């Protein structure tokens, strides 16, 4: 707000343009672009990128936009490809943020971890919304292109598998789909054999003085997360006295937010599959929708959900 008797408004603080005087605004003709504008650039924007990096260069758009290669003549296959490619990009970012948060937890730097966990939850919301686009594909449209997919399936996504492992849903059998790619197999195996994000949070509870069972702190990391009474007792204390354990309280809620979003992603996945292929077998050999429905029962952070009943 301009104080009485002050100077005229300075105009836009971002573009640097000054506001027009009332007389100018009332009597001057609107500006018509001419030759001088063409030489200077539209609104002083840089137009020649022959000697500097452009938007497309920075984002490697040629590589990204040339990565769609439909195998069928069907129009709808482009949607199918881009849906899955963009999901893989979001998963790449989710893994990047989750690993950053894990490193922060290991060093007790919790505020940065909260920021990264919140971002992962927002990424999962993007993935949930993406199913709305794919659900515009009808069963007849999918049937026209399905024979061209062969045995390829989202079940084989190595980034998704690492995300599951990092969140604690471990299963050594899920290494097998990647055995033909030793470089990828090494990445997925390393995630399987390392502590999950929640394992590191449980270690954090121990560092903060909670009596966590020794067998929970040093367990077989290749096994899925199991409910532990000492971990639930720690979370119960945190929830009963949040002001005394505020960082841990915030961590607990960030994890619940994350799993909530992850469950919604899974639910939208199975609903979209049922909508498009019903209960047919999946291209990767699974039972399709029934397999995905079983995944809805997986609980990533069991004590954080059970403690709500105990409180």
Curated annotation (Swiss-Prot):
Cofactor(s) recorded in Swiss-Prot or TrEMBL: heme
EC id: 1.13.11.11
InterPro entries (alphabetical): Trp/Indoleamine_2_3_dOase-like, Trp_2-3-dOase_bac, Trp_2_3_dOase
Subunit note: Homotetramer.
Associated pathway: Amino-acid degradation; L-tryptophan degradation via kynurenine pathway; L-kynurenine from L-tryptophan: step 1/2
Cofactor, free-text remark: Binds 1 heme group per subunit.
Domain of life: Bacteria
Family named by the database record: Belongs to the tryptophan 2,3-dioxygenase family.
NCBIfam families: trp_2_3_diox (TIGR03036)
Residues that, per the record, bind heme: 269
Residues noted as binding substrate in the record, renumbered to the chain: 80-84, 142, 146, 283
Enzyme kind, highest EC tier: oxidoreductase
Swiss-Prot/TrEMBL GO biological process terms: L-tryptophan catabolic process to acetyl-CoA; L-tryptophan catabolic process to kynurenine
Organism lineage: Bacteria, Pseudomonadati, Pseudomonadota, Betaproteobacteria, Burkholderiales
Listed PANTHER family: TRYPTOPHAN 2,3-DIOXYGENASE
Coiled-coil boundaries: none
Keywords associated with the record: Dioxygenase, Heme, Iron, Metal-binding, Oxidoreductase, Tryptophan catabolism
Organism: Burkholderia orbicola (strain MC0-3)
Protein name as it appears in the record: Tryptophan 2,3-dioxygenase
Region ranges (Disordered): 1-37
UniProt biased composition (Low complexity): 17-27
SUPFAM superfamilies from the UniProt entry: Indolic compounds 2,3-dioxygenase-like
Catalytic activity: L-tryptophan + O2 = N-formyl-L-kynurenine
One Gene Ontology molecular-function label: heme binding
């Amino acid at each position: 707000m301009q104080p009485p008797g002050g100077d005229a408004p300075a105009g836009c603080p971002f573009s640097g343009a000054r506001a027009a005087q009332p007389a100018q605004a009332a009597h001057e003709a609107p500006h018509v672009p001419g030759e001088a504008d063409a030489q200077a650039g539209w609104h002083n924007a840089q137009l020649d990128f022959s000697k500097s990096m452009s938007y497309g260069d920075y984002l490697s758009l040629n590589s990204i936009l040339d990565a769609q290669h439909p195998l069928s003549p069907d129009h709808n296959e482009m949607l199918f490809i881009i849906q899955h490619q963009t999901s893989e990009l979001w998963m790449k970012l989710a893994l990047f943020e989750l690993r950053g948060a894990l490193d922060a937890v290991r060093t007790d730097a919790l505020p940065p971890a909260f920021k990264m966990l919140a971002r992962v939850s927002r990424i999962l919301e993007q993935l949930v919304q993406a199913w709305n686009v794919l659900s515009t594909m009808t069963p007849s449209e999918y049937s026209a292109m399905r024979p061209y997919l062969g045995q390829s399936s989202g079940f084989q996504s190595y980034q998704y598998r690492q995300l599951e492992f990092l969140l604690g849903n471990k299963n050594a059998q899920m290494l097998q789909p990647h055995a033909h790619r030793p470089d990828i197999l090494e990445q997925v195996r390393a995630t399987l054999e390392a502590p999950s994000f929640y394992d590191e949070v449980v270690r954090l509870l121990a560092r903060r003085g909670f009596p966590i069972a020794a067998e929970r702190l040093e367990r077989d990391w290749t096994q899925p997360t199991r409910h532990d009474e000492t971990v639930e007792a720690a979370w119960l204390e945190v929830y009963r006295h949040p002001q005394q354990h505020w960082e841990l309280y915030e961590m607990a809620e960030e994890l619940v937010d994350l799993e909530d979003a992850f469950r919604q992603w899974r639910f939208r996945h199975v609903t979209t599959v049922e909508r498009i292929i019903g209960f047919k077998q999946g291209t990767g050999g699974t039972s399709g929708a029934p397999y995905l429905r079983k995944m809805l029962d997986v609980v990533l952070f069991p004590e954080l959900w059970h403690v709500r009943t105990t409180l």
